[in-house]
Amino acid sequence: MLYNLLLPHIHNSHIANLFHYITFRSALAIIITLSLSFITGPILIEFLRSLQKNGQPIRSDGPESHQTKVGTPTMGGIMIILSSCLSTLLLADLTNKYIWITLFGFISFGIIGFMDDYAKVTKDNHYGVRGKSKLLLQGIISFIICVLLEYLDKSPSHLLNVPFFKNLSLDLGYCYIVFAIFVIVGSSNAVNLTDGLDGLATVPIAFTAGSFALISYLVGNLIYSNYLQLTYIPNTGELTVLCAGLVGSCLGFLWFNAQPAEVFMGDTGSLSLGGVLGIISVITKHEIVLAIVGGLFVIETASVILQVYYFKATKGKRIFKMAPLHHHFEKHGWAESKVVIRFWIISVIFALIGLSSLKLR
């Protein structure tokens, strides 16, 4: 909004000219989202606590230390969604189609998560909306997004770029749409599975969003994309502002979500954040890089899949003491803070590996 209002005055005002730069608007997005989180956080937490008598239901079969979390309100993802969307609407170019498509997906996945959180709180159990129902809704939203991208792009690309290899890409044809839906839905649920400890998912999400802020900027810049031999996709640079807003929102939320958490992001936050990261990776054609940068989410998801299939195949035996993987280490006696910080370190390593793929070819 501010960008569009100041655009006619860019050449006449030094201050207005600053808004011409994506980097300036991205930095401002981080500041705004952080400030909004600090200001609205206590108000939202108190409001959620007044509505939720028992807070988020805690699994009885989980680590014993989790029983101390009883009464902690959920749906804190509302704080992340509102601050991110507001900063994007203020600072991004509102004539950019990718901004609106991404915001549509972000909010839609947030609504699905809100429905799930609401069901958990009102029924006072941790099951919420049925898994198949959530997958169906996620699939429908992802399909709509893919159709919009196909329709709005004059020459939609169905190429899957392979990182670390020069000029290597796979033409998936219209199967790419199915693949893109899988990426978006998979990313949404992977982040959701990782969000099981205080602050655990928040920092890796911030690292991933920060990585894609850089990727969006490079892919949307003709000079940099040619130099790095990346697929040039015009107008994706504006997604840098949105990604920066996500970073600021997550850091602001971490202020209240650090152990012991005052609020949980819930599925409202995890499904929406995972979904928006998947959408951005599809738009920028860096789907595989998302799996690398967000490697922690992949590992957590793989641990659940392996646990379920092994349990069924062996009729009751388990690979891990408990899945997702972070609970396995808790069951081994690791303190929650140790699990969280070590997983943060792992996420930093994955982010660096993913970003190195931009140059190493």
Swiss-Prot record:
CDD domains linked to this entry: GT_MraY
Any one biological process term the GO annotation gives: cell division
Superkingdom per UniProt: Bacteria
InterPro entries from the UniProt entry: Glycosyl_transferase_4 (IPR000715), PNAcMuramoyl-5peptid_Trfase (IPR003524), PNAcMuramoyl-5peptid_Trfase_CS (IPR018480)
Membrane protein topology class: Multi-pass membrane protein
One Pfam assignment: Glycos_transf_4
Catalytic activity from the UniProt record: UDP-N-acetyl-alpha-D-muramoyl-L-alanyl-gamma-D-glutamyl-meso-2,6-diaminopimeloyl-D-alanyl-D-alanine + di-trans,octa-cis-undecaprenyl phosphate = di-trans,octa-cis-undecaprenyl diphospho-N-acetyl-alpha-D-muramoyl-L-alanyl-D-glutamyl-meso-2,6-diaminopimeloyl-D-alanyl-D-alanine + UMP
EC number: 2.7.8.13
GO molecular function, one term: phospho-N-acetylmuramoyl-pentapeptide-transferase activity
Pathway(s) annotated for this protein in UniProt: Cell wall biogenesis; peptidoglycan biosynthesis
Location in the cell: Cell inner membrane
Transmembrane segments: 28-48, 74-94, 99-119, 133-153, 168-188, 203-223, 236-256, 263-283, 288-308, 338-358
Cofactor(s) listed: Mg(2+)
NCBIfam families: mraY
Family from the record: Belongs to the glycosyltransferase 4 family. MraY subfamily.
Protein name (database record): Phospho-N-acetylmuramoyl-pentapeptide-transferase
Organism: Rickettsia conorii (strain ATCC VR-613 / Malish 7)
Name of the gene this protein is made from: mraY
